[in-house]
């Protein structure tokens, strides 16, 4: 595994080292690995005005795999603490916090998300206490079969949930409609992540799923340009609230117009995910 950041500008190296120190203070990890675009030297900082007049911004995340022995605190709580202490960075921080046994189980199965991190990542901190298992290398045929199976399961769910959402919308049952629409969106993110990486995060939070899938498709990420548009951020927040707030909180409200826009947008998302996933599967095997 690589240990040098010399392929990055000094300013980026200093930021990464500062983040590593914050992670160490919060988590007490066994290993910290930088992975993704900054590890590979392929990071992007992309800003432009679209034909719709909306400003779009795509900035690569700082991606870290944080390896622990045991976690007494929930992963999302640790992530929230770290994110609150790194808000001053322009680059978003993406954290994968996992126990070593979970990671090694994935490596032994042939899960290419963790295998790619071990192969391409940059080791930023290591206590020397734990080791990664030798990753099982899937054959191209196995990789394609697994990706197709994941796609068949999760994309089909998105299709069924979208039917349910539209039916509820026609009945003016807007809370049920947005709940089903959340399930559509979640299923589409899961399908994308599993087809491309073989990995599905343990979260229903759409903001986090969007961040996890960010490096897989800029077009998918910018389907909701929440970073540069308050209107888009509010729409996506309403969609995110469909999972719990729409079902259990009396003060949750969504208008017919807002829901109609979301249904149309997620319908576009479904078409996009179908295209990028089937293209990916065709390249395998």
What feature does the model see in each segment?
Residues 25, 31, 72-80, 94-285:
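Terminal alpha-helical segments
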Residues 30-51:
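Short gly/ser-rich loop at a beta-strand->alpha-helix junction or flexible surface loop bordering the NTP-binding
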Residues 2-26, 45-108:
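Metal-dependent nucleotidyltransferase catalytic core
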